Amino acid sequence: MPSTIRLEVVTPEKVVFSEPVNILIAPAIDGEIGILPKHTPLVTGLKTGVMRVKKDGEEVKISISEGFMEVKPDEINVIVRTAELPHEIDVERARDALKRAEKRLNSRNDRIDRARARAAFERAIARLKAAGHY
């Protein structure tokens, strides 16, 4: 059995990650899912969170927003709205976004779009977790 599977993470703007990996753990809509080489083909929705990629004993965290994942026995294609590697994340900006989202979620103003505030909150948490600051 091969010890790696090709992972490609793409957004509308760019290819964020494209390398062979040993395992991918991703935030699927029904819970975390782990993908190893030679996995059964599948397509699943992804929710905002942190993907963990293990390669040669190292772990890389990638902050993602919602999207989809297509798995084939020899490759994984992840298509998401946004994705960031830890070194790309502006931690202060993510902290500020978290504070703003918390403030909106705690507001009693009926004009606040709670779904958007919740999405912003989840994105900020994912970014901080991927950067190792949450």
UniProtKB/Swiss-Prot annotation:
CDD domains cross-referenced by the UniProt entry: F1-ATPase_delta
A molecular function GO annotation: proton-transporting ATP synthase activity, rotational mechanism
Subcellular location: Cell inner membrane
Keyword Cell membrane: yes
Main location: membrane
One GO cellular component, as annotated: plasma membrane
Keyword tags: ATP synthesis, Cell inner membrane, Cell membrane, CF(1), Hydrogen ion transport, Ion transport, Membrane, Transport
Entry membrane topology: Peripheral membrane protein
PANTHER family in the record: ATP SYNTHASE DELTA/EPSILON CHAIN, ATP SYNTHASE EPSILON CHAIN, CHLOROPLASTIC
Family that this chain belongs to: Belongs to the ATPase epsilon chain family.
Described purpose of this protein according to its UniProt entry: Produces ATP from ADP in the presence of a proton gradient across the membrane.
HAMAP family assigned: ATP_synth_epsil_bac (MF_00530)
Known partners and oligomeric status: F-type ATPases have 2 components, CF(1) - the catalytic core - and CF(0) - the membrane proton channel. CF(1) has five subunits: alpha(3), beta(3), gamma(1), delta(1), epsilon(1). CF(0) has three main subunits: a, b and c.
Name of protein: ATP synthase epsilon chain
